[in-house]
Amino acid sequence: MINEIKKDTQQRMEKSLETLRTHIAKIRTGRAQPSLLDGIQVEYYGSPTPLRQLANVVAEDARTLAVTVFDRSLISAVEKAILTSDLGLNPSSAGTTIRVPLPPLTEERRRDLIKIVKGEGEQGKIAIRNVRRDANDQIKALLKDKEISEDEERKAQDEIQKITDTFVKKVDEILADKEKELLDF
């Protein structure tokens, strides 16, 4: 029973970490990364469709993304979607390829982005701590129902805490990498 709780806790914390990675990947660093455009939705036959399903996005160089649209008729819709996104990008089309130059980040903007990254990191840590709290509540319920002893409860809670510490450390590593990426460019 305790092993199931630990396994479930680890899986839920892994999902929290993956969510954090996804959110942080969307934060622009000044370096061209195809994942920057992952959140963009394009109007396609009346319904919003992810850009990834309609085009291929690659980093042409350190400051330019190249978006190759599969269907020529969608070029203007894709261009409009990129332009109206809150990323502050100005695409230009040439044939079936849309080039998206990334403007350099100002020092002030970098500081703002670091604050956003830290906020996302804190949300990730909160999610991980909430998972820990749920696991500890389940363990306390087992003790209350006399399914485990107090020693087993203490041991299980210590193990859950070790798992939590590992995941919080991973969050800190992700944040440090992103901050370094923002400052080094």
From Swiss-Prot:
GO biological process, one term: cytoplasmic translational termination
Swiss-Prot/TrEMBL keywords: Cytoplasm, Protein biosynthesis
Coiled coil: none
Cellular localization per UniProt: Cytoplasm
Predominant place of localization: cytoplasm
InterPro entries reported in the protein's UniProt record: Ribosome_recyc_fac, Ribosome_recyc_fac_dom, RRF_sf
GO MF annotation terms: ribosomal large subunit binding
Gene3D superfamilies associated with the record: 3.30.1360.40, Ribosome-recycling factor
Gene Ontology CC annotations of this record: cytosol
Protein family according to the UniProt entry: Belongs to the RRF family.
Role played: Responsible for the release of ribosomes from messenger RNA at the termination of protein biosynthesis. May increase the efficiency of translation by recycling ribosomes from one round of translation to another.
Entry protein name: Ribosome-recycling factor
Organism in which the protein naturally occurs: Histophilus somni (strain 2336) (Haemophilus somnus)
